[in-house]
Structures are given as structure tokens and as C-alpha cells.
Design a protein with these regions (language model features):
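Short amphipathic alpha-helical signal-transduction/dimerization elements
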Residues: 25, 130, 134, 138-149
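Short solvent-exposed loop/turn micro-motifs enriched in small/polar/acidic residues
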Residues: 1, 35, 60-61, 87-89
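Beta-strand/loop substructures that line and gate deep hydrophobic ligand-binding cavities in soluble
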Residues: 80-136
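Intrinsic-disorder/low-complexity, polar/charged segments enriched in Ser/Thr/Lys/Arg/Asp/Glu/Gln
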Residues: 1-7, 49-51, 75, 91, ...
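Hydrophobic pocket/interface hotspot
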Residues: 17-21, 78, 106-108
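Hydrophobic ligand-binding cavity/cleft-lining segments
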Residues: 1-47
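Glycine-rich portal/gate segments that line the openings of hydrophobic small-molecule binding cavities
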Residues: 29, 38-85, 140-144, 148
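A short, structured loop/turn motif at beta-sheet edges
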Residues: 11-15, 45-46, 69-73, 95-105
């Protein structure tokens, strides 16, 4: 199992960060460049939830169908429903809070339970090297959000 936690600050407001996490338009691929456009599909959407298939071309292709829930203010939880690599119950958690002088603090948790050999290998890799990878990726996305004002 891989469990990675990281925290970053942004000049973007919490509302803008939450909006970027829950924006399933074509703009999503611009803000989150690690999403492989060939796997991205919005399955369904409700006022505070969505079913989405997304993935990455890395490691021969990793995809997951996930349930997004942003019904709790400042929080987006993404629960894996199906994946070619990880078990259902794996998740992402984003908690976004305002900073005293403007901007936001983003707390991210990534938890993966391997489904197969590929998942075991990725979990081992992410356990060792996941934090800097996710910090860099999230940092790049936050810069894109800040620049899109």
C-alpha cells in the first residue's frame, strides 16, 4: 500500500482551487497536465459529486474510474471505484483552507492499495519517491490555477 501526504500553499483562493479540482470541462486537461486525454471521460455529474475515468500514460497506462465528492466545504475526496492497477477503496483527499493573508493551504493525501503486480510495483515506487513527485505535480497545477486568474 502507498500512502503519500503533502502540503503546499498557493496564492489562489480556496474557491479557485476547489473549482479546479471539480472542473470537468476541457479545461481540466490544461490545469492537470498529468491526465492522459485518451483515458479522460466524465461519466456523470451531480451538484456536489461526479463519476470520472482518468489516467496517466506513465508505466504503460494507469487508469481509474473514481467518485468525486465535494459536498463538505473545502474538501474534495476522490474514491477509486475501478482501476487497472489499484483496488477500489484507494483514494485522493484534498483539503483546502484559507491562509490568513490570502491564498490557500492545500493538504493532499494519496492512498493506493495494489490490485495486481503492476500496482504492487507502483505502490513500492510511490512509497519511496511519491512525495516529491506529487509535490511537483500539484505545485505545477497550482501555478496554472494562479496564472488563470
Amino acid at each position: 500500500m502507498a500512502h503519500v501526504v503533502t502540503d503546499l500553499d498557493s496564492t489562489a483562493s480556496p474557491e479557485r482551487v476547489i473549482h479546479a479540482l471539480t472542473d470537468f470541462s476541457s479545461r481540466r486537461l490544461e490545469l492537470w497536465p498529468n491526465i492522459d486525454p485518451t483515458t479522460y471521460k466524465l461519466e456523470s455529474t451531480e451538484p456536489t459529486s461526479a463519476e470520472v475515468t482518468e489516467g496517466s500514460a506513465s508505466f504503460g497506462g494507469v487508469w481509474e474510474r473514481s467518485h468525486y465528492d465535494w459536498s463538505r466545504s473545502g474538501t474534495v475526496r476522490i474514491d477509486v471505484q475501478d482501476s487497472n492497477t489499484f483496488e477500489p477503496g484507494s483514494y485522493w483527499l484534498y483539503e483546502v483552507t484559507p491562509l490568513p493573508n490570502g491564498g490557500s493551504h492545500v493538504h493532499m493525501e494519496f492512498d493506493r492499495r495494489p490490485r495486481n503486480f503492476k500496482g504492487q510495483m507502483l505502490s513500492a515506487l510511490l512509497t519511496v519517491a511519491g512525495k516529491p513527485v506529487f509535490q511537483k505535480s500539484l505545485g505545477e497545477t497550482l501555478k496554472r490555477i494562479e496564472a488563470s486568474a
